[in-house]
């Protein structure tokens, strides 16, 4: 099928062949498929959805549109991703905390999407902090410091970078297949061993009901594990803002408060829940009790 036929097929609720999905993403990557056609496809997916297999193929094609990071043998590479919510500054505290546990966290983050603030926007409120890094520079920082938070290089999942911006202005943000493909394509391009997902639901999240969040979590975990990355998810409440501060600079302050042991209890609880489970999942600790004990030691010791 040509691109117009692919759009029409999805509009009518048909299941797309692998080759049709590959053709669409490849065309979008080389700019032979314009934004208006991809917008139409995104809206068709929003209303008709995708099967788990379609989503997995779409995700793989997004990864294959660019490079993948490679890491030295013997290092455990992990990451976390949140679907976003009001006041969500968890990643800013979580990445360095995980790095102190001996794993490496190459955190590729995004900008504000819909009503939620983006981690990159928050990090850029730190004077002199650069989020636009070349792949070699990003890799070097992670190898030296254990973690880095940066934007996706133009060579990492480039098709997603364009689609991510397109969804924000076309009313197609809250689509489980598109959310899954966007998040996981960036994560898989990082060269991860383990991934944990923070799927938020409620009035301040994209998923308004816990059932929607559960369905998204199941889809993402299935696709992630099918593609060879150990993947799990937590479903967390976003019916009220996370923490006490809303705004890029003040959320940085609140995240550092968590690392100093004086942060808001709700933010600290989410950080610890995600970190402890990810460390067990990655094989750093054998159980949650040991994992939580190590995290508490790190916070108390400064």
Task: Report each predicted region and the residues it spans.
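Active-site-proximal beta-alpha loop/turn segments in soluble metabolic enzymes
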Residues: 42-45, 160-169, 198-207, 238-241
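Alpha-helix C-terminal capping segments
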Residues: 47, 93-106, 186-191, 226-227, ...
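Phosphate/diphosphate-binding glycine-rich loops and adjacent basic-rich segments that engage nucleotide
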Residues: 143-190
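Functional cores that coordinate and move charged inorganic groups
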Residues: 195, 199-238
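A glycine- and small/hydrophobic-rich beta-loop-beta segment
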Residues: 4-15, 223, 230-302
């Amino acid at each position: 099928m040509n691109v117009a036929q692919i759009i029409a097929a999805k509009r009518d609720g048909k299941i797309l062949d692998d080759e049709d999905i590959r053709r669409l993403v490849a065309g979008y990557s080389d700019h032979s498929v314009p934004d208006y056609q991809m917008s139409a496809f995104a809206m068709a997916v929003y209303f008709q959805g995708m099967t788990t297999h379609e989503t997995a193929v779409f995700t793989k094609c997004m990864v294959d549109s660019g490079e993948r990071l490679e890491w030295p043998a013997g290092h455990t590479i992990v990451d976390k991703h949140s679907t976003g919510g009001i006041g969500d500054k968890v990643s800013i505290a979580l990445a360095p905390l995980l790095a102190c546990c001996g794993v490496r966290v190459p955190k590729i983050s995004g900008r504000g999407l819909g009503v939620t603030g983006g981690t990159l926007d928050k990090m850029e409120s730190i004077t002199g902090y650069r989020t636009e890094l070349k792949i070699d520079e990003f890799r070097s920082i992670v190898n030296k410091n254990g973690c880095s938070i940066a934007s996706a290089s133009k060579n990492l999942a480039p098709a997603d970078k364009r689609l991510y911006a397109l969804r924000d202005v076309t009313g197609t943000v809250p689509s489980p297949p598109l959310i899954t493909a966007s998040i996981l394509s960036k994560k898989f391009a990082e060269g991860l061993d383990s991934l944990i997902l923070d799927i938020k639901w409620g009035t301040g999240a994209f998923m308004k009901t816990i059932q929607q969040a559960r369905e998204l979590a199941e889809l993402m975990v299935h696709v992630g594990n099918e593609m060879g990355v150990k993947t799990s998810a937590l479903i967390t409440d976003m019916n009220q803002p996370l923490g006490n501060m809303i705004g890029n600079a003040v959320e940085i302050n609140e995240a550092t408060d968590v690392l100093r042991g004086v942060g808001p209890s709700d933010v600290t609880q989410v950080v610890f829940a995600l970190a402890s489970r990810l460390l067990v999942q990655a094989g750093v600790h054998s159980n949650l009790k040991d994992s939580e004990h190590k995290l508490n030691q790190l916070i108390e010791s400064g």
